[in-house]
């Protein structure tokens, strides 16, 4: 079979930098098991600047919402724990934190909030953290920062994003 070239690569200044995926991630790849996203596949897809279908984002939010609405307001944490704070839309910083801090499958994480605003990838941060939280309910703790309120997000760039 003859190899087919990608017509979208012809106009790229840096030919070795692949373009983002043209289509949103397939539902079956995101949710291979009912109500449990494949967080690793999502991480890979978002790292390539891939998109999700609006219906999949809503499904992810609803599953996440059902988990966090039952969590206590005050949490007691046993060490060891990896603490991550103030990501502010820096998705690639989150990836580095996960690399340095340890695999969420066997590392307890405490995220201190301020996931959104300032950076350009706030939505990607929320999507990935929600999918990790859904998979590891008892070892991923997400606190709400001051940027996770309507007043702050209306003044910064998350509303536009």
What are these regions (language model features)?
Residues 1-161:
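Feature recognizes metal-dependent phosphohydrolase scaffolds
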């Amino acid at each position: 079979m003859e190899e087919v070239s990608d017509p979208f690569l012809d106009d790229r200044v840096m030919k070795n930098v692949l373009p983002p995926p043209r289509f949103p991630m397939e539902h079956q790849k995101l949710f291979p098991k009912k109500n449990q996203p494949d967080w690793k596949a999502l991480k890979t897809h978002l790292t390539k600047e891939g998109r999700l279908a609006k219906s999949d984002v809503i499904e992810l939010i609803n599953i996440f919402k059902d988990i966090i609405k039952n969590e206590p307001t005050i949490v007691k944490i046993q060490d060891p724990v990896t603490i991550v704070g103030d990501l502010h839309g820096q998705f690639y910083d989150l990836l580095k934190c996960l690399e340095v801090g340890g695999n969420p499958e066997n590392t307890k994480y405490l995220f201190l909030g301020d996931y959104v605003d300032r950076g350009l990838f706030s939505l990607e941060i929320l999507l990935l953290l929600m999918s990790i939280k859904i998979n590891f309910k008892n070892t991923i703790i997400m606190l709400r920062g001051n940027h996770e309120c309507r007043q702050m997000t209306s003044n910064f760039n998350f509303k536009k994003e």
